[in-house]
Amino acid sequence: MEWINEKAKTLKQGAIRAMFDRANTMTGVISLGIGEPDMSTPKLVCEAAKEALDKGITHYTPNAGTLSFRQAIAEKSYLKDLHYDPNTEIIITNGGMGALSLLFLILLNKGDEILIQDPQWLNYVAQVAYCDGTAVRVPTDLEHNFEMQPETIEKLITPHTKALMINTPNNPTGSVMTRETMAKIAELAVKHDLLVISDDVYNTLLYAGEEAPCIAAFPGMKERTVIVNSFSKSYAMTGWRIGFVAAPAEIVDRMTKCQENFNACANAPGQYAATVALDHPELCEELRQTFERRRSILLDGLARIDGIRCNRPNGAFYVFADISSFGLSSVEFCNRLLDEQKVVCIPGSAFGECGEGFIRIAYTCSDDNLYEALNRISCFCKKLMK
């Protein structure tokens, strides 16, 4: 008897996890690979969770999450001007990944196509495939700041295209979609009757005066937009698994029924703590300022290394650096950098074909480790240039 089904056999370990597994066998490694804040969750949020435990808030919540939390998201988050109904248009999920998995489960029929940027965080592609959908790559490049071009998107739309995914600020590139580009994409979505899935998880991490407009705010878009977000990056709460979706009531209703049958609800103390966190936007700002400082350290350091080329990304906590001049594949470059200098970066090919020739560098470590990692990368690149 074969116990494992054919779909499960298609799931593979990602290149990111493979790099960490190799690094874990070594000592003295500096990781510029991890896609999460290195700091702990703010004490105020942790104290709120303890308060929830002391109050006995340890039971199931409604499948859609506590109403008080949904109300706080509707009234206190960046969505407040869009007037989402907390009763019918917001659901609390097990992180942003839990939100996406529920969404794809209720959205996709076999053969439905979703347009996804390349390079892009590849869990999107795996989840779409597992739900019988087809991920169609939208190529981007450094010259256009890794921003999807509306004319490229339109050429890829077919009768099977159901949705378009956007992620701004972006993982892995750190790029932020301009308001002008977003407006054109919104027009395309209306013209072709597409759903837009907007992964906003990095939208508090913006630098150099950058703004991150919400596509649901454009004409005709609220009724065709699914906003996915979480508290993981903005409040350093990756391990808490607290996310949410704001979307048309029909979609939220189906996601809620799906959540009831698959995992009941998000954890109750985490929902309580995240509700408190929304009263303290200064916590997000403290994280943002830290990452903006580190961004400057990293970009200034990379600018002094011959052979490396990159843009100045204004969001998230990544730099997507061009290492093609060294004549190595991105996997070869990262493996040798780890072996010879004990620095973890992620090969760009892990994020799609358009990522080949690049490496993702996350500035999610201390300033001191960042300076040391830059010294090691510089030594490594000088050796390659000889």
Predicted ranges, named:
Residues G56-Y60:
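A short acidic, glycine-rich active-site loop
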